[in-house]
């Protein structure tokens, strides 16, 4: 399975959808290509928080720290947690194989 990893999306009702996803794409891109409801209003340009996702701590700790720009956008996210990230900023790597991504029940699109 070279070049692909397993990603499990956990939808707000607890339903799980596991997909095989190419390394190098973002969580936002994978969600869209699998018809999952993750908005991404700014199309990954770090101008909104509508692709806010919640990760399990094990995988959150494998990521590089969020940039200041991502942290600023996360401050606007509805239901922010200690392991919240923006789906557009999580690029899949081999070490993220098996990642579980919780899709929050609601997002907030704040236009400045």
Curated annotation (Swiss-Prot):
The entry's [2Fe-2S] cluster-binding residues are: 42, 48, 51, 88
Q: Which GO terms describe its molecular function?
A: 2 iron, 2 sulfur cluster binding; electron transfer activity; metal ion binding
Similarity comment text for this entry: Belongs to the adrenodoxin/putidaredoxin family.
CDD domains recorded for this chain? fer2
For this entry, list what GO says about its biological process: P450-containing electron transport chain
Protein name, UniProt field: 2Fe-2S ferredoxin
Which UniProt keywords are given for this protein, alphabetically ordered?
2Fe-2S, Electron transport, Iron, Iron-sulfur, Metal-binding, Transport
- Domain of life per record: Bacteria
Give every 2Fe-2S ferredoxin-type domain span: 5-107
Q: Which Pfam families match?
A: Fer2
Its required cofactor(s), as named, are:
[2Fe-2S] cluster
SUPFAM superfamilies assigned to the protein according to its UniProt record, in alphabetical order: 2Fe-2S ferredoxin-like
Query: What this chain does, per the record?
Result: Ferredoxin are iron-sulfur proteins that transfer electrons in a wide variety of metabolic reactions.
Cofactor note text: Binds 1 [2Fe-2S] cluster.
């Amino acid at each position: 399975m070279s070049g692909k990893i397993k990603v499990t999306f956990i939808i707000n009702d607890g339903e799980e959808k596991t997909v095989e996803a190419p390394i190098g794409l973002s969580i936002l891109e994978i969600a869209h290509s699998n018809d999952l409801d993750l908005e991404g209003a700014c199309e990954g340009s770090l101008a909104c928080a509508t692709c806010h996702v919640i990760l399990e701590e094990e995988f959150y700790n494998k990521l590089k720290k969020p940039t200041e720009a991502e942290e600023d956008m996360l401050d606007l996210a509805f239901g922010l947690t200690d392991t919240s990230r923006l789906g557009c900023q999580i690029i899949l790597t081999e070490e993220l194989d098996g990642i579980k991504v919780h899709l929050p029940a609601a997002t907030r699109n704040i236009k400045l």
